[in-house]
Regions:
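Aromatic "clamp/platform" in nucleotide-sugar-dependent glycosyltransferases that forms part
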Residues: 128
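Short hydrophobic beta-strand element within catalytic cores of glycosyltransferases
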Residues: 124, 145-149
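Nucleotide-activated donor-binding/catalytic signature segment of Leloir-type glycosyltransferases, i.e.
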Residues: 89-112
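Donor nucleotide-sugar binding/catalytic pocket of nucleotide-sugar-dependent glycosyltransferases
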Residues: 1-12, 16-32
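Glycosyltransferase donor-sugar binding loop
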Residues: 75-90, 107-108
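Conserved donor-binding/catalytic core segment of Leloir-type glycosyltransferases
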Residues: 38-55, 61-64, 78
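Short acidic alpha-helix that forms the nucleotide-activated donor recognition element
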Residues: 110-121, 141, 155, 159
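Conserved acidic donor-binding segment of nucleotide-sugar-dependent glycosyltransferases
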Residues: 164-173, 181-183
Length: 184
């Protein structure tokens, strides 16, 4: 198993003795980059994720909408999608454009660009199904703040990291309140 929460679920569901299941965290190569520092002009909320529905882009988009409605305008969101991956993502991009939300669809990034983005952003990670949640580990490695869905994988992935905060998975209002604290 890759994580403790996966081990606990296997033990519980398969009724296997816990001592027979080992957690072997996969090796993850972190790139050297400058330590985290917030963008000077505005907050940047970064969501590196593919297009599957379980990544929960909808909750993030709703949080962005609520943030804008409260008058917070000095921010942008950066998504590693190009906006035409599937019907669901196309609909989200169209909605973001119609509501003039500052969500940039930048497409895939090199590892170097990815780590540079972590170093100047707040990671928002609303996904509700992951094994490890690699972006959590990557953002933590540069000292970036993390706003993550309150799921077992996320708690396991960030451990006792003091810059991690959690929101109920589909609670866009709570996420927007957490994001607002980073706005100037």
């Amino acid at each position: 198993m890759q994580t403790n929460w996966m081990k606990e679920e296997i033990v519980r569901q398969c009724k296997i003795p816990a001592e027979r299941v080992q957690v072997k965290f996969p090796p993850v190569e972190m790139l050297k980059t400058d330590p985290w520092q917030m963008e000077e002009e505005h907050a940047v909320f970064f969501f590196p994720a593919g297009p599957p529905a379980y990544k929960n882009h909808r909750t993030f988009l709703k949080a962005c909408e609520l943030l804008k409605k409260r008058g917070c305008t000095d921010w942008e969101a950066v998504w590693t999608l190009n906006g035409d991956e599937n019907d669901g993502i196309r609909a989200l991009k169209k909605e973001a454009e119609e509501k003039t939300l500052p969500i940039r669809f930048v497409g895939m990034m090199s590892r170097e660009d990815l780590f540079a983005q972590y170093a100047r952003s707040v990671l928002v990670f609303p996904s509700y199904i992951e094994t490890i949640g690699l972006p959590l580990l990557e953002a933590r490695s540069v000292g970036a703040p993390i706003l993550a869905a309150d799921c077992l994988y996320a708690r396991d992935g960030v451990g006792d990291y003091e810059k991690a905060e959690f929101f109920e998975t589909f609670n866009a209002k709570k996420l927007s309140e957490m994001m607002e604290r980073f706005c100037r």
